[in-house]
Amino acid sequence: MVNATFDTAAIAAIQALIGKTFNGYTYSPVAAGAYGNILLHIDGTAYELRCNQSPLTVGNETEDIACLSINMHTGDFEPMAGEVITTESVEQIIKEICIIRDAVTRADGVQLSMDMAIIIKTQNAEYMFSRDVWFSEFITISNNGDLDSVYPICKAKSGWKSDESEDVIIKRTTIRL
């Protein structure tokens, strides 16, 4: 099993954000999101959400798999791509945080577990920061907590197939923190 998921410490840190004020987020706009990193401002503290490729052993090969991570951030925001920096204000209490996880089983039997999105739910809105294809470092930003409407499983499957004869099974689950 290949794990491209938040570790236990990251899950605990994310869960600790519930009940705090989501002040907003800072990013360098690229299409409908950001390339590589976003700053989440929560109760006056900055947390950097990153989507970076990491070399992982997948079957008999090493593949660069994009993985989500989150860490406290100090200093100026340095976007991985882009020069324009935008800050979106939210100023709402976090009621719930969800992580969307895909369990992938490839035709060759290799299994992967990948965190695909983090959804921050406030009293008035949902803010989803999601990734798509397994190698992409792009983070899509949307005000809807439905990953299937942004990146459906059929699209995720096509990203794993080298030809149409290959079968890929993807099970998507929501982890409520």
Predicted features, each with a name:
Residues 1-177:
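Surface-exposed, interaction-prone regions used to assemble/regulate multi-protein complexes
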